[in-house]
Amino acid sequence: MNISDVAKITGLTSKAIRFYEEKGLVTPPMRSENGYRTYTQQHLNELTLLRQARQVGFNLEESGELVNLFNDPQRHSADVKRRTLEKVAEIERHIEELQSMRDQLLALANACPGDDSADCPIIENLSGCCHHRAG
């Protein structure tokens, strides 16, 4: 298979595939006599794993570690599960942070009259000071 075939099958761009190869995240493909990359089912599996791991929140390094585990016949599912649960905990912390930000913004929005006045509790709160206008 050539890179355009692999791109169609995996849903990745040719540029992304080359990037993953450059970063050493996938097994290097063989080169044909004319220098073109030749991909196998193994490459499809690795690239699909990378794409899907990225989609569920694993960063590049973590995704590469999953590919390494995928390629390790001595891997233990406990290692994969541990990494997955660590990612879930990280996502839960991020959700808590986002919920806190949302709550703060809603409280600020509720305190703001939203009228033609220059007085704005949102700006005052975010700037850390009170805005006083000369009368």
Curated annotation (Swiss-Prot):
Where does the HTH merR-type domain lie? Answer: 1-69
Effect after changing C112S: Loss of sensitivity to copper
Cite a single GO BP annotation.
Answer: DNA-templated transcription
Mind telling me which SMART domains this protein's record contains? HTH_MERR (SM00422)
Query: What is the deletion mutant like?
Result: Loss of Cu-induction of copA, forms smaller than wild-type colonies when grown on 2 mM CuSO(4).
Record Pfam families? MerR_1 (PF13411)
- Provide this UniProt record's keywords sorted from A to Z: Activator, Copper, Cytoplasm, DNA-binding, Metal-binding, Transcription, Transcription regulation
What GO terms fall under cellular component here?
cytoplasm; protein-DNA complex
Q: Which Gene3D superfamilies match?
A: 1.10.1660.10
* UniProt GO molecular function: cis-regulatory region sequence-specific DNA binding; copper ion binding; DNA-binding transcription activator activity; DNA-binding transcription factor activity; identical protein binding; transcription cis-regulatory region binding
**Subcellular locations according to the entry:** Cytoplasm
Residues involved in Cu(+) binding: C112, C120
Give the annotated DNA-binding region, as residue ranges.
4-23
Provide the effect of C120S: Loss of sensitivity to copper
Q: How does it assemble?
A: Homodimer.
Q: What does this protein do?
A: Regulates the transcription of the copA and cueO genes. It detects cytoplasmic copper stress and activates transcription in response to increasing copper concentrations.
Other known facts? CueR tightly binds Cu(1+) via a linear S-Cu-S center.
Xref: NCBIfam families: CueR, PRK10227.1
**Comment, domains:** It contains an N-terminal DNA binding region and a C-terminal metal binding region.
Q: What is the official name of this protein in its record?
A: HTH-type transcriptional regulator CueR
Source organism per entry reads Escherichia coli (strain K12)
* Gene giving rise to this polypeptide: cueR
